[in-house]
From Swiss-Prot:
Domain Rubredoxin-like: 162-200
Full protein name: Rubrerythrin
Pfam families recorded: Rubrerythrin, RUBY_RBDX
Biological source species: Porphyromonas gingivalis (strain ATCC BAA-308 / W83)
Primary role: May provide oxidative stress protection via catalytic reduction of intracellular hydrogen peroxide.
Encoding gene per record: rbr
High-level lineage: Bacteria, Pseudomonadati, Bacteroidota, Bacteroidia, Bacteroidales
Amino acid sequence: MSIKKKTEMNKSIKGSKTEKHLLMAFAGESQARSRYTFFASVAKKEGYEQIAGVFMETAEQEKEHAKRFFSFLEGGMLEITASFPAGIIGSTAENLRAAAAGENEEWTDLYPAFAETAEEEGFKEIAAVFRQIAKVEAEHERRYLALLAHVEDGSVFERTEEIAWQCRNCGYVITSKKAPKLCPACAHPQAYFEPMKTNY
């Protein structure tokens, strides 16, 4: 596979700054994936099934980002110097805030800088991948901040206007300002309700 990569890029990344940036990005995405699975467990315990689901979905997306970055590496050992979050597992609100901050750093600072270096070193495909993944990280931050706002203002299960709420367990839908305490169809608790997705 590395021979194919060299052919596509017309040169090896070995010894380049881009090689180090790819490994740093791979490590960062891999760690984010693990953190998000830890955060999902906390959200579930606190009664936020939707937020737990978002953390797990994002963890899988981070795995795919890590896989993409890893696919450009050409093997061997590589020493890097980098800083990574050594945070704690907090409450759901604290975890959402920490996750949003990490996503923000990736899309506003790290990946644009990595893309610029890759471009300067002649790795246009890698530069494009850094830029495209940065767009995803911006969406991750937006989603985490929206969920955080609902946790902080107590609107995870109650809104000012009527909306469609859907049970994540059985699919039951009810239109109301507030999600029911128990699902009338499957008797799962309110924790399983989320605003119904309508953008299919």
